[in-house]
Amino acid sequence: MSQQKIGVLLVNLGTPEHPTAPAIRKFLKPFLADSRVIDYPKFLWKPILYSFILPFRPRKVKPLYQHVWTNEGSPLYANAIGQEKALQAHFDQSEHGVLVRATMAYSKPSISDVVDEFLKEKVAKMIVLPLFPQYSSTTTAAIFDAFAQSLKKKKDIPPFDFIHHYYERPSYIQALAQTIHLQENEHLLFSFHGIPQRYVIEGDYYTEHCQQTAQLIAVAAGLSEEQWQVSYQSRFGPEEWTRPYTDETLIQLPKQGKKKLAVICPGFAADCLETLEEIDITNRKHFMAAGGQAYRYIPALNASPAHIQLLAELISERL
């Protein structure tokens, strides 16, 4: 009797296929049109998106993508494929028939394409793992919507598990804590992707997860309260976002005598534009120009053995 297969979707939001304005526009269009991401009334938002953002923003951010692009594609795509291969290799050594696929909510390889593949393989179950340790309606819920949409016209839907969050998981906390290694007189900044503050007021508990994540990692790394703090990066548009802002914090830290800095981004399961360019290049310049003496970015977990073990643990519990 053949072994039943389990299909695993490792899901990120997405990335351009090329560092060109048309490719960036192709990615941004569905991303920014999703009401989970930008929830303004469509009759107000669509004219802004199509008349002001999509015609101009791709050209503005194109050089940023070009700074960090790799021979394998965007950093996010390359890291996602690396995670897929490492996790597949892990399960190939086990007794379970697991198919692992990296997939994206707003780009290729799409969730719908992977779901179609799994249905053709007649998997006994699907496990959806959004690679966002902290829940947010802008990420985790958006991925759930995309997964549900991929099943909308299917008749043969197998059972599935959807992993809501894993920020408090000891193996996640320990994996990140082991990467820190603070040096003498070095301060640690936990930088998480921000969301509009209004979303928090309306019930999104993302920032609560972020604060708890930072606290747990700091304790695991043996840090005192004075050695670390939290900020939020990557704000977009005129609305108030979750504070304090990372770019403003980096300018203030040297004035407070914190001139040696390490930055870690626990919300990013893979290095991407927001970590490699925004944090490691642009914000490094801001910090050093403000009087900083040393700046160190601590890479995401990517396809490290500790990260693959964590992901395997999350999946194995649901087989």
Curated annotation (Swiss-Prot):
Supply the SUPFAM superfamilies for this chain. Answer: Chelatase
Give a yes or no for keyword Iron in this entry. yes
Example GO CC term: the record gives:
cytoplasm
Q: Which GO terms describe its molecular function?
A: ferrochelatase activity; metal ion binding
Q: Does the keyword 4Fe-4S apply?
A: no
What this protein catalyses is:
Fe-coproporphyrin III + 2 H(+) = coproporphyrin III + Fe(2+)
Any one GO BP annotation for this protein:
heme biosynthetic process
Q: Which Pfam families match?
A: Ferrochelatase
* EC numbers on record: 4.99.1.9
Q: Where in the cell is it found?
A: Cytoplasm
**Its pathway?**
Porphyrin-containing compound metabolism; protoheme biosynthesis
Binding, Fe(2+): H193, E274
Instruction: Name the keywords, alphabetized.
Output: Cytoplasm, Heme biosynthesis, Iron, Lyase, Metal-binding, Porphyrin biosynthesis
Alphabetical list of CDD domains matching this protein: Ferrochelatase_C, Ferrochelatase_N
**Domain of life the protein comes from:** Bacteria
Task: Name the family the entry cites.
Answer: Belongs to the ferrochelatase family.
Described by its record, this protein's role is as follows: Involved in coproporphyrin-dependent heme b biosynthesis. Catalyzes the insertion of ferrous iron into coproporphyrin III to form Fe-coproporphyrin III.
UniProt-recorded name of the protein: Coproporphyrin III ferrochelatase
The organism is Streptococcus mutans serotype c (strain ATCC 700610 / UA159)
